[in-house]
Amino acid sequence: MGRLQLVVLGLTCCWAVASAAKLGAVYTEGGFVEGVNKKLGLLGDSVDIFKGIPFAAPTKALENPQPHPGWQGTLKAKNFKKRCLQATITQDSTYGDEDCLYLNIWVPQGRKQVSRDLPVMIWIYGGAFLMGSGHGANFLNNYLYDGEEIATRGNVIVVTFNYRVGPLGFLSTGDANLPGNYGLRDQHMAIAWVKRNIAAFGGDPNNITLFGESAGGASVSLQTLSPYNKGLIRRAISQSGVALSPWVIQKNPLFWAKKVAEKVGCPVGDAARMAQCLKVTDPRALTLAYKVPLAGLEYPMLHYVGFVPVIDGDFIPADPINLYANAADIDYIAGTNNMDGHIFASIDMPAINKGNKKVTEEDFYKLVSEFTITKGLRGAKTTFDVYTESWAQDPSQENKKKTVVDFETDVLFLVPTEIALAQHRANAKSAKTYAYLFSHPSRMPVYPKWVGADHADDIQYVFGKPFATPTGYRPQDRTVSKAMIAYWTNFAKTGDPNMGDSAVPTHWEPYTTENSGYLEITKKMGSSSMKRSLRTNFLRYWTLTYLALPTVTDQEATPVPPTGDSEATPVPPTGDSETAPVPPTGDSGAPPVPPTGDSGAPPVPPTGDSGAPPVPPTGDSGAPPVPPTGDSGAPPVPPTGDSGAPPVPPTGDSGAPPVPPTGDSGAPPVPPTGDAGPPPVPPTGDSGAPPVPPTGDSGAPPVTPTGDSETAPVPPTGDSGAPPVPPTGDSEAAPVPPTDDSKEAQMPAVIRF
């Protein structure tokens, strides 16, 4: 190439870069914002990045979020804001801030003109409702939830945001004094803000997709079911977490509220006085009053975590199983990782990852019995027999350890996700349903070689980390990442993961109740990647056989869960509690065997006892359930008025601060008032405690942290006194949490199926 040609090429490239499209200052309902335009190469493509745009006013402790008043001049949106207040990994100090409700936006730009009408993808981070942030952990100066790779490779707008977590986000008395769900309402405020303002950034406000993982995936699910989001969401993706997961809904919030109140010195005898005291308590003290034990647990971690969403009769008007008609027009993808339960199994049973340690029958039986408390001895025996059937033919430690992981994967993630998919499909009108299983093995070097895809391993591939930080990844990792970004962004554009601007490795068929089809995501995908009936025999066991077992009384129940005082040793099972539970031997009463026959047939959704696995709606499922609404009889009304229209830039004197849109669109619907009294108190059955995700994106080779790995979960506090007693009697009658001294409060039984 001659010198003249090189000069011409150089000038052409410089002209392309100089003339690349960019947004500049953007007008929002709060005022003008200006981000950064990042060049992506010599051809002129770029991405506009806005960090730290407020979507709500600074928070007040244990109160709903409020609209932001706006600002004067142009807001420089160039740096991530602090996360919401939460405990550090040592749980002896806090970081973050109460003023934390900010969002971040990535907008891909071409060479000629700024983008218009792009699909919008809003990410909700996980972290057990205890920790996390909208930008995630930092790895090689690249944050986990940096949206650049998704935005530029998929040609979509990506939005991430902060929401309140831990006691400040989810503490509730179970009534109107402290209704809870503040973190969910923060999420809703962010979604509504995007709906009203994203057109100014080049997005299509009528094509919004939510996606999230773990507690974020469950949050996505809950947001689609809430009547507050009617008309705001077009599509949704739940990764390793749905509203029906046993760790999502707290059925005994008063118990946990009292534990925190005792720690900070607030009265617990009267809910109103307790609530007033908690609201004026130092938010840092509230955060540190709740600690999760991370080692030496006597019971599964599921028992120790308490600050999660509640059924408040308003934002979540009823049990999520009865709200799927609200998502009838929302396209939905849901799936799990093939060893989602590994990190939790390794905490509950540390021998899992230790080659010189063995898992015994007694160990596994004890674990099973602690997950099946409400079904007593028979529930423990039948479940143990079903899961250990292969041990006679293969008694190896690898097989036994895999069994423990499969058990926790099924209970915590896979079974509830399969039920959620069936519910969505059964209620869907125009919406499509898709299922997946992520099976690309974990990169964690300290794990045994048999470990598959652990909890949160999928996040790094969705966010394109193999491209953003290529030195830590292999070509096969980039293959997986490319496929996931293609499927996810195609789905955001069209509602079909196969159709869009990105080529996919194989066709992903929709999920139906007849075929139970799912796509297995691996490094090498083809026609054989589309499979049927994932772990059907185990799914049928939980939704049919186990469900049919009688619920036991408190005297018959096996282990008593811990009381919440992480400093005290949990009380072991009663009865012959001096010895560890012994697995059944010989013919233990011929426990029921999981249904056989045509295993390819989809499992029958559970019915009957509502205390057990979620039950699909019966009768006219097309009619959405009406939430309790005072004496009005009408469901909450989503934002109306001018909420669908983008804010109009000010005219005349531009020096005056812009005025946000008027009307009620900026705030969430106001709960009805009247003489109806406080919303119903949730039952005490299921603790809904979320598992704690792995920590991690630390500098070692690409193991994705669960969101905000820099912090650790935070749990039960206070001396509870006597050990709590599992729910008693007929599970169809939801027990009401005690309202007197919390030392008499019941500890929820964590599993319903």
Swiss-Prot record:
Subcellular location: Secreted
Positions bearing carbohydrate: 207, 558, 569, 579, 607, 618, 629, 640, 651, 662, 673
Gene3D superfamilies assigned to the protein according to its UniProt record, in alphabetical order: alpha/beta hydrolase
Sequence repeats: 559-569, 570-580, 581-591, 592-602, 603-613, 614-624, 625-635, 636-646, 647-657, 658-668, 669-679, 680-690, 691-701, 702-712, 713-723, 724-734, 735-745
Gene Ontology molecular functions: acetylesterase activity; catalytic activity; heparin binding; hydrolase activity; retinyl-palmitate esterase activity; sterol ester esterase activity; triacylglycerol lipase activity
Residues at the catalytic site: 214 (acyl-ester intermediate), 340 (charge relay system), 455 (charge relay system)
InterPro entries per record: AB_hydrolase_fold, CarbesteraseB, Carboxylesterase_B_AS, Carboxylesterase_B_CS, Mucin-like, Neuroligin/BSAL
Protein keywords: Diabetes mellitus, Disulfide bond, Glycoprotein, Hydrolase, Lipid degradation, Lipid metabolism, Repeat, Secreted, Serine esterase, Signal
Pfam families in alphabetical order: COesterase, Mucin-like
Subunit structure: Interacts with CLC.
Protein name: Bile salt-activated lipase
Organism phylogeny: Eukaryota, Metazoa, Chordata, Craniata, Vertebrata
